[in-house]
A protein has these predicted regions:
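Active-site residues of response regulator receiver
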Residues: 9, 55-56
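Two-component/phosphorelay signaling modules centered on CheY-like receiver
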Residues: 12-32, 99
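Helix N-cap/capping motif at the beta->alpha junctions
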Residues: 33-42, 63
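Short amphipathic alpha-helix used as the core "switch/output" element in two-component signaling
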Residues: 42, 64-77
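The feature encodes the CheY-like receiver
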Residues: 59-62, 89
């Protein structure tokens, strides 16, 4: 069964690494990309992915704002939203969860750690 995932990140290199890691976890994953909230909302108006991964640090709107906007879409009530960043404070994590995020994760510097984290998230 194909799992559809949306990655929201303005960094093309990060998207490439994340996509490769996801595909190493599960070959049946279909990844779509958006560089900002506007692109994401355009995509989400026509699609309902199983998971949405959002980078916290983006130029026009931070990840918490993205979580808040996406959670307003009723059709995505079962979609799991994961916020990720190089640094996740306890306060940021609590705020994201209160806004409806499924989980907050720190971006690991090593691909094998990223793959391990993704396996845990996707196999829940």
């Amino acid at each position: 069964m194909t799992k559809e995932i949306l990655l929201i990140d303005d960094d093309a290199d990060e998207l490439e690494v994340f996509t490769e890691a996801l595909r190493s976890v599960d070959k049946n994953i279909q990844c779509s990309h958006a560089k900002d909230l506007n692109e994401a909302l355009d995509f989400l108006n026509h699609n309902s992915p199983a998971y949405i991964f959002i980078d916290y640090n983006m130029p026009t709107m931070n990840g918490l704002d993205c979580v808040s906007e996406i959670k307003k879409m009723e059709k995505l009530e079962n979609t799991k939203i994961i916020l990720y960043s190089n640094y996740i404070s306890e306060e940021m994590s609590q705020k994201a969860i209160s806004l409806g995020a499924y989980k907050c994760v720190k971006k690991p510097s090593m691909i094998n750690v990223l793959i391990k984290n993704l396996k845990e998230i996707l196999n829940h």
